Structure formats: structure tokens, C-alpha cells
Regions:
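Alpha-helical transmembrane segments of multi-pass membrane proteins predominantly involved
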Residues: 1-197
Length: 197
């Protein structure tokens, strides 16, 4: 999934391919075959779903002259025309890439540690490599939003309060959740113990 997403210019396809890579990370926890591995899986999935809600709310709001747009180049200098929206997406992309201190970083850390502790060091190393590759295509989107070429007519300003709310709420969770993951660690640990008993 990580390799397939590299050359994509369609943001929907890019995110679809990246989803394959993210499922791979989640399955590392399952492959560990331990209670901690299940805990890591549950934490990762909760974080990933939250990130995806915001990301796809952003994608669905991408329109030009009232028509849906999927080309990544259409995001050129979005930070200038819609700074709040661009910043929220930047936070989500950094979190998806696993950049510290975003919550997505801790999600990846959990599954990588679970794999390593279970003696699957090769799998953890493969996960780190895939994460580095993934960071490339996520940061490419950030580049377009902040350093791309100027456009005479940018994307339409979203008029959907629901999509905007999902985007902003997801981004805020990725930042604020760093404090204690909203108690997710304890809940996931309890659920994992129940599942292995």
C-alpha cells in the first residue's frame, strides 16, 4: 500500500492505498499474539478511525465551482486561502505519517513495540520502513498546501458545517489526545485482557 500510494495524484486513491498500509500496522498487534498486541491493535484502530473521519471530511469538502475535485495539485497554496482548513489537514497528515508528538505517532509506537516484544523484530523494522515511505506522500500534500504554486481560483470555501466540524474535531483530538490518549490505553488494556481470557 505504501509503495502504490507514492505516485498517486488523486487524493482519494492515495488515501485508499495508504489504508492498506495502515491495516498492515494494525495487524502487527494481532501478529504479536499477546495481550499487549491486542491492546496495541485496539489503540491503533481507534486512532486511525478518528484520523480518517477528519481526512475524508476534508476530501469530501474539496470542490471547485461546486464540483468535486480529487487532484492533489488543486490544494496549491490552500494555506493562504483557507488557513484553518489547511492547518487542520496538516495536523491529520502529520498524525497519519506518525510524526511526533501527534497521536498517530503513539499508535504506531504501540504496534511496533508489540511486534518487537513478541520477537518479530523483522516485522517492526518493515513497519518503520513503510512509515518512512508513507511520510513522503503525506508530506507531499502538505507541500502543495503550503509551498505550491499560486492559483487564480482556489478551492471553494466549504459551506458544510458538518464536514468542517468533523475535520476540526479530528485535528484537535490528534493534538490534545497526546496528554493521555483520552484514557484509551486503559480501556484497550481491559478489552485486550477480556479477549485473551
Amino acid at each position: 500500500g505504501a509503495f502504490a500510494a507514492i505516485g498517486q495524484t488523486n487524493i482519494k486513491r492515495l488515501m485508499a492505498y495508504s489504508s492498506i498500509a495502515h491495516m498492515g500496522y494494525a495487524l502487527m498487534g494481532l501478529a504479536a499474539g499477546t495481550a499487549f498486541g491486542l491492546q496495541a491493535l485496539l489503540i491503533y484502530m481507534a486512532i486511525y478511525v478518528t484520523m480518517n473521519i477528519g481526512t475524508f471530511a476534508f476530501i469530501l469538502s474539496m470542490q471547485k465551482d461546486g464540483k468535486p475535485v480529487t487532484d492533489i495539485a488543486s490544494l496549491n497554496m490552500l494555506s493562504r486561502s483557507q488557513p484553518g482548513k489547511a492547518l487542520a489537514m496538516l495536523v491529520l497528515l502529520f498524525s497519519l505519517a506518525g510524526v511526533p508528538p501527534m497521536v498517530g505517532f503513539f499508535g504506531k509506537l504501540y504496534v511496533l513495540r508489540a511486534a518487537f516484544d513478541a520477537g518479530l523484530a523483522w516485522l517492526a523494522i518493515a513497519g518503520v520502513i513503510a512509515s518512512v515511505i508513507g511520510a513522503f506522500y503525506y508530506l507531499r500534500i502538505v507541500f502543495f498546501m503550503y509551498f505550491g504554486e499560486e492559483q487564480e481560483i482556489g478551492l471553494d470555501v466549504s459551506k458544510s458545517p458538518v464536514m468542517s466540524s468533523f475535520l476540526m474535531a479530528s485535528a484537535i483530538i490528534m493534538v490534545v489526545g497526546v496528554a493521555n490518549l483520552f484514557g484509551l490505553e486503559g480501556l484497550a488494556a481491559a478489552a485486550a485482557q477480556t479477549l485473551v481470557q
